[in-house]
C-alpha cells in the first residue's frame, strides 16, 4: 500500500486558468434554506486539517464569485464549517476591524510535492489579481504539511510550505516577512533535524498577517451568517 499523500486529502480542484484533473462525481446538494429562515450563530474557531484563504475588505458574495462556487447560499457557522470539512467551501462574513473574509475547505489547491505539480500558485496569482491580495494557509498534521503564502496583485510575496512526511520544503520563496521575523519563524528552506514549521506556526503567521481562525470563538464576535458553496 502506498503512503498517503497530501494531494490525496486536499484535492487541487480550484485551478483558475489551468487544466484540472478529472473531477470526482459530484453529489447533488439539498436546496439551502433562504437567509431569512436561518438563525445567525456565533463564529466558531477552525483551522486544523484545512486550507483557508484570507481576503481583506471583500464581501463574502464577491469571494464566492471569485472562487467560482456552485450554488452559493447563506449558511450558519456550524453548517458551513461542517460543509468545509466535507469538501465544500465556507466563506465567512467580514471579521475584525479590517474586515477579513476567510474561505475554508479541504478541497483548495495544494503546493504539490515531488510527484505532483504546484496547483496552488496559479490560482493564487489569479485571485490576487482579482482582489489585490490573497493569503493562503494550510495545516494537516497527518502528513506534517504546514504552509503559508501571501500574493499581492498577481505576484508572490512570500511562499513557505513544509511537507514533514518527506522532510521537504515544497515552497521556500521570498524573504521572511517582518511579521515572521518578529515571531522568530525564520526557516532556512531546508530541514534541520526534525525542525520545520508546525501547526502552531501557521496559526501564528495567520494572526500576524490577517486573523487566526482558531481564535474566533474567543473574540466576542456577534452572531452572523456566511456563504457555503461547492468548488468548481
Regions picked out by a protein language model, each given a short descriptive name:
Residues 1-11:
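Bacterial N-terminal signal peptides that target proteins for export
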Residues 11-15, 19:
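Hydrophobic helical h-region of N-terminal Sec-dependent signal peptides
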Residues 26-28:
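Bacterial signal peptide processing site
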Residues 33-68, 229-231:
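Short, extreme N-terminal segment that most often corresponds to the first beta-strand
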Amino acid at each position: 500500500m502506498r503512503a498517503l499523500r497530501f494531494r490525496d486529502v486536499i484535492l487541487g480542484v480550484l485551478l483558475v486558468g489551468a487544466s484540472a484533473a478529472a473531477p470526482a462525481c459530484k453529489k447533488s446538494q439539498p436546496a439551502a434554506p433562504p437567509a431569512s429562515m436561518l438563525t445567525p450563530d456565533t463564529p466558531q474557531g477552525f483551522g486544523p486539517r484545512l486550507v483557508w484563504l484570507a481576503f481583506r475588505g471583500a464581501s463574502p458574495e464577491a469571494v464566492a464569485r471569485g472562487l467560482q462556487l456552485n450554488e452559493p447560499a447563506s449558511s450558519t457557522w456550524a453548517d458551513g464549517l461542517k460543509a468545509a470539512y466535507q469538501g465544500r467551501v465556507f466563506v465567512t462574513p467580514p471579521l475584525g476591524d479590517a474586515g477579513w473574509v476567510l474561505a475554508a475547505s479541504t478541497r483548495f489547491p495544494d503546493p504539490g510535492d515531488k510527484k505532483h505539480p504546484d496547483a496552488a500558485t496559479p490560482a493564487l496569482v489569479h485571485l490576487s489579481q482579482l482582489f489585490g491580495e490573497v493569503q493562503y494557509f494550510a495545516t494537516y498534521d497527518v502528513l506534517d504539511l504546514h504552509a503559508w503564502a501571501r500574493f499581492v496583485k498577481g505576484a508572490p510575496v512570500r511562499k513557505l510550505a513544509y511537507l514533514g512526511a518527506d522532510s521537504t520544503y515544497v515552497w521556500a520563496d521570498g524573504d521572511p516577512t517582518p511579521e515572521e521575523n518578529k515571531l522568530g519563524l525564520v526557516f532556512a528552506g531546508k530541514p534541520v533535524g526534525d525542525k520545520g514549521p508546525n501547526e502552531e506556526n501557521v496559526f501564528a503567521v495567520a494572526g500576524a498577517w490577517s486573523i487566526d481562525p482558531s481564535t474566533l470563538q474567543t473574540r466576542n464576535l456577534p452572531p452572523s451568517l456566511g456563504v457555503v458553496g461547492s468548488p468548481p
